[in-house]
């Protein structure tokens, strides 16, 4: 078996695509328009990675309740401090740089328009 994708449901497809492209560098890899059946699917991936993030847009559905079971998705960064500063300057909802107790900062979180968190971690940790 091989990991294929993670699906999240979004209330505003264009806002979500823009967030994942601008904040994290994802690119749209494919789209499936099932508007006649009430939904659209957009798949995104990071450069050089075949694992996809699937954005599911159910037409006419409002915001989703993420609940307390969802944690986060994680991506690696070659320039953690630079990516953090850029996202903060561009107005994305980011935490401060963090580390585990007794360790130097090595990650932060950024939140998408629907409230889903992505952990950005220093590559090689």
Residue ranges and their predicted role:
Residues 1-17, 70-73, 121-125:
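N-terminal beta-strand motif that seeds the catalytic metal site of vicinal oxygen chelate
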Residues 7-50:
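Core segments of cupin and vicinal oxygen chelate
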Residues 12-13, 77-81:
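Helix N-cap motif at beta-to-alpha junctions
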Residues 16-19, 83-87:
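Hydrophobic side chains in well-ordered alpha-helices
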Residues 29-33, 75, 84-125:
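Vicinal oxygen chelate
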Residues 38, 69, 104:
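Exposed loop/turn and edge beta-strand positions of beta-sandwich/beta-sheet ligand-binding modules
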Residues 47-51, 60-62, 80-82:
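Short, charged/polar surface micro-motifs in flexible loops or helix N-caps
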């Amino acid at each position: 078996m091989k990991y294929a994708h993670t699906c999240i449901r979004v209330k505003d497809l264009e806002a979500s695509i823009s967030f994942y492209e601008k904040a994290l560098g994802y690119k749209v890899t494919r789209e499936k328009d099932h508007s006649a059946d009430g939904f659209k699917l957009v798949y995104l991936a990071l450069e050089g990675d075949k694992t996809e993030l699937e954005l599911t847009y159910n037409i006419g559905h409002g915001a989703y309740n993420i609940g307390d079971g969802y944690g986060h998705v994680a991506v690696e960064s070659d320039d953690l401090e630079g990516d953090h500063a850029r996202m903060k300057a561009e107005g994305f909802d980011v935490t401060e740089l963090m580390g585990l107790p007794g360790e130097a900062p090595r990650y932060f979180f950024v939140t998408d328009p629907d409230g889903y968190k992505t952990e950005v971690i220093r590559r090689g940790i």
